[in-house]
Amino acid sequence: MFRRHFLTLSLTLCLALFCLIPNAEALGGKQPSLNEPAPEFTLPTNTGDGKISLSDYQGKWVVLYFYPEDFTSGCTLEAKRFQQDLSKYQARNAQIIGVSADDVQSHEAFCDATGVEFPLLADTDGSVSKAYGSWLGIRSLRHTYLIDPDGMLREIFLGVKPPIHSRQVLARLDELQQ
């Protein structure tokens, strides 16, 4: 009897908590504001001179995408889709940058295994993910931010679906560039 009441109470509490939180994306923290300067950052990377700052891409559109972890199925699919469309982004003066809590060595191995040619940044302490409202405990959430050539945040994608996400970002980029 006690066990049944305990399970019922536990289930009720979990359901109530689930209903109080509108969606998992809200758990990542406060999102930066659209049409305001995007939070500046500098992080280690697997490419170039070893560090990348947002300001390095002044004059270009930036597709800044956060993802949970190298070598997981959804993250691998998302990265491969961005890579497949890389020339389309380049034709639109856009740079793709991936961010996760993985270290540089993991990013190097991930790029070697998947053929990804754009930079991946190592946000091992979550500081940049937190600044973008994309951090949940020990990893980044799957969020993407479109930043214009002047460093202004123009679009936020939450609840990303890896199989179609790159196409969605390209479509929105086209709208914003008109």
What kind of region is each of these model predictions?
Residues P39, W61, L141-H143:
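Short loop/turn microsegments at loop-to-beta-strand junctions
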Residues F41-V62:
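A short beta-strand-turn-helix
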Residues S140-Q178:
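Thiol-/selenol-based redox modules, centered on thioredoxin-like
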Residues V63-L64, I96:
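Hydrophobic beta-strand anchors of alpha/beta hydrolase catalytic cores
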Residues M1-L11:
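Bacterial N-terminal signal peptides that target proteins for export
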Residues Y65-F71, A101:
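Aromatic-flanked redox-active Cys/Sec active sites in thiol-based oxidoreductases
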Residues H5, L17-E40:
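N-proximal helix/coil linker or "cap" segments that precede and/or mark the start of modular domains
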Residues G74-T114, T124-K130:
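Structural microenvironment flanking redox-active thiols in thiol-disulfide oxidoreductases
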